[in-house]
Amino acid sequence: MPVMRLFPCFLQLLAGLALPAVPPQQWALSAGNGSSEVEVVPFQEVWGRSYCRALERLVDVVSEYPSEVEHMFSPSCVSLLRCTGCCGDENLHCVPVETANVTMQLLKIRSGDRPSYVELTFSQHVRCECRHSPGRQSPDMPGDFRADAPSFLPPRRSLPMLFRMEWGCALTGSQSAVWPSSPVPEEIPRMHPGRNGKKQQRKPLREKMKPERCGDAVPRR
């Protein structure tokens, strides 16, 4: 009976000897794959991949041909080159400056009729650039600013304009201040509740402005 107990062990030994030997190079490769180190993509490569350029994008056929919405196409979307990506300035947008037409053959399916092949022309973006969007530039105030917006609103992320709204002056490179050209209301009383619950009259806006906090005030004529 001891022979019967050793027989399964003998079979396992034979199976282990029949397996191919693993070279030490594969051991090192397996150990390297199991490490926790992650490759870091350098900044230049990240910037190049994310910058404004024409990339392949899937576009719905119906979005390019709205009049064909009652029909079905196969495939329902096509691969086109479209401008996408980031710009170095938040006021700039990735827009196409050169386009080209491409004609594709699709299967058009009509209700009640047999499917038929049709040729549709699509526009592809060839060259892209970062430019200002039309209708968002203002000759008086730089930055991301709409032309139809009120003139007293500061542009986004414009620190000098925030100083102008708060203190009545705008900081410049020479640390001087310039009074705003828009008229400042002086005789418009506004009532607001005081600490004791009674309404109190606010001081004129010009009295709150302290140009000495921004430097030597230079009145604008």
From Swiss-Prot:
Disulfide bonds join C52-C94, C83-C128, C87-C130. N-glycosylated. One of its GO terms (cellular component) is extracellular space. It is found in: Secreted. Gene3D superfamilies: Cystine-knot cytokines. Residues 193-213 are annotated as: Heparin-binding. Keywords: Angiogenesis, Developmental protein, Differentiation, Disulfide bond, Glycoprotein, Growth factor, Heparin-binding, Mitogen, Secreted, Signal. Residues 1-18 form the signal peptide. Its main location: secreted. Residues 175-221 are annotated as: Disordered. SUPFAM superfamilies: Cystine-knot cytokines (SSF57501). It holds the Pfam family PDGF. Glycans are attached at N33, N101. The keyword Signal applies. Coiled coil: none annotated. While the three isoforms are present in most placental tissues, PlGF-2 is specific to early (8 week) placenta and only PlGF-1 is found in the colon and mammary carcinomas. It comes from the Eukaryota. Residues 192-203 have a biased composition (Basic residues). GO terms for molecular function: chemoattractant activity; growth factor activity; heparin binding; vascular endothelial growth factor receptor binding. Residues 204-221 have a biased composition (Basic and acidic residues). One of its GO terms (biological process) is signal transduction. Belongs to the PDGF/VEGF growth factor family. Growth factor active in angiogenesis and endothelial cell growth, stimulating their proliferation and migration. It binds to the receptor FLT1/VEGFR-1. Isoform PlGF-2 binds NRP1/neuropilin-1 and NRP2/neuropilin-2 in a heparin-dependent manner. Also promotes cell tumor growth. Antiparallel homodimer; disulfide-linked. Also found as heterodimer with VEGFA/VEGF. Isoform PlGF-3 is found both as homodimer and as monomer. Isoform PlGF-2 contains a basic insert which acts as a cell retention signal. This is Placenta growth factor. It comes from Homo sapiens.
